[in-house]
Regions:
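ATP/NTP-dependent adenylation/nucleotidyl-transfer catalytic domains that generate, transfer
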Residues: 1-237
Length: 237
């Protein structure tokens, strides 16, 4: 896609040395355009790669990877994707090395140049926080209707029990970091609904789905202030 993207940067007057959101989204949309056109050419379908966690956070480019002809991962959270790959690798020796390498690679949209040593520069969780926390919130919010305070308490208790099970006698949980991740989740979940309102069809695998034609109908201009206010109260405890 290099030539097509560089031509587009020229067409819209964008300096390609400016590695901003426009630089990234041009690539994401060009990928999608090419896939759509090739699918027409061969009579196929563009299979979406986006998962449930990315849909919840709006971590996708509108009319880029947000769009496909069928979203096979639309109801599978990011943390479960890793678990599925690890489980599949255990039973398929011919793919084990490749799948485990994928699991060990930091999650990234790979839209920015790498570091000088060739390592990934753009790491998703450095930008939007922990998928473990986000998936925990999503499940208890969407499936059970719990608010921030209850989800916070549940997460702290679950994390503490997990640490003890792993041999940590007196685990210390960074509550401020948990609240920071929760704030990111609630802000992004509410402001990114417009991407879910026009998401493509997909399969529902588990008990949680964000399809506007199924389990989740929400106005794109809904306000998250009630949930953020409750989080702010937790910060002051």
């Amino acid at each position: 896609i290099k030539d097509a993207c560089e031509q587009h940067y020229k067409d819209i007057g964008h300096d390609k040395s400016n590695l901003d959101v426009t630089f990234e989204n041009v690539q994401a949309r060009e990928r999608t355009q090419i896939l759509m056109d090739i699918s027409n050419k061969i009579g196929g379908l563009v299979v979406g790669t986006g998962d449930l966690s990315e849909l919840a956070l709006g971590w996708c480019t509108y009319n880029g990877d947000q769009m496909s002809m069928y979203g096979v991962n639309a109801s599978i959270p990011k943390t479960l994707v890793r678990g599925i790959l690890e489980s599949y690798a255990q039973h398929h020796n011919e793919l084990r090395e490749t799948l485990l390498d994928i699991c060990d690679t930091p999650v990234s949209p790979e839209l920015l140049p790498p570091n000088e040593d060739g390592t990934i520069k753009q790491k998703t969780e450095d930008k939007i926080g922990s998928y473990v926390i986000h998936d925990f919130i999503l499940y208890y919010m969407q499936r059970h209707g719990f608010g921030p305070r209850k989800i916070f308490d549940l997460y702290i208790n679950a994390k503490t029990m997990h640490e003890k099970k792993m041999g940590v006698e007196n685990p210390v949980i960074d509550k401020a970091d948990v609240l920071k991740n929760m704030e990111i989740f609630y802000n992004r979940f509410w402001t990114q609904q417009f991407k879910r309102s026009c998401m493509p069809d997909g399969v529902k695998v588990g008990s949680v789905s964000l399809s506007p034609r199924g389990d989740w109908r929400m106005a794109s201009d809904a306000c998250q202030s009630i949930w953020i206010d409750e989080l702010n109260e937790l910060k002051n405890i």
